[in-house]
């Protein structure tokens, strides 16, 4: 039996930035963390791991391709994952797409490498986890699932990422907490409110110390 492997050149990356940001009170992608926007932090971190990269959003963002949702309404992050799959499927040589969230600026620097290493077969999905919780928005998806996801979203009213995952072969990769000067940081710490953004500023300083 041949061991399955996937190379970095076969993976595209997409930042999911299409959320409504209601609790933040403004667009999260443009919120400033230190001297840069959240989107710039996440794009930089992702592009250090994989190329090409794009942003799933409704408006122009930074200097990368922007791919809007194909499903409107209350489709949530699953619509962004679908848009990411369709985008990546159109790129030559790309078999998988990794998705990350714009509100998680500290996600692991080895996210893509570890998700890719966990795959045992072409059709498998790999998702991240930490502290006993899964983070399905941080996933490595085979682009061949785009048609299946589209058909499922048309017929299913829930449109939740976790419900879609139940239909498929999934492996979960647990990432450790990251040591900082202050304490241990969950790399999937996410920013939903102004208070979260203030806390992220403190984590940023602790990481730079």
From Swiss-Prot:
Binding residues annotated for GTP, in chain numbering: 16-18, 28, 56, 69, 103
GO biological process terms held by the UniProt record: bis(molybdopterin guanine dinucleotide)molybdenum biosynthetic process
Cell compartment(s), UniProt: Cytoplasm
EC number(s) from the headed UniProt entry: 2.7.7.77
Enzyme class, UniProt record, top EC level: transferase
Major localization class: cytoplasm
Cofactor names: Mg(2+)
Binding-site positions, Mg(2+): 103
Reactions listed under catalytic activity: Mo-molybdopterin + GTP + H(+) = Mo-molybdopterin guanine dinucleotide + diphosphate
Pfam families: NTP_transf_3 (PF12804)
Domain of life according to the entry: Bacteria
Keyword Repressor on entry: no
Any one Gene Ontology cellular component term annotated for this protein: cytoplasm
UniProt entry tagged with the keyword rRNA processing: no
Keywords from the named record: Cytoplasm, GTP-binding, Magnesium, Metal-binding, Molybdenum cofactor biosynthesis, Nucleotide-binding, Transferase
GO terms assigned for molecular function: GTP binding; metal ion binding; molybdenum cofactor guanylyltransferase activity
Domain-related comment: The N-terminal domain determines nucleotide recognition and specific binding, while the C-terminal domain determines the specific binding to the target protein.
Role: Transfers a GMP moiety from GTP to Mo-molybdopterin (Mo-MPT) cofactor (Moco or molybdenum cofactor) to form Mo-molybdopterin guanine dinucleotide (Mo-MGD) cofactor.
Family from the record: Belongs to the MobA family.
PANTHER family in alphabetical order: MOLYBDENUM COFACTOR GUANYLYLTRANSFERASE
Assembly behavior: Monomer.
Protein name (database record): Molybdenum cofactor guanylyltransferase
Gene designation: mobA
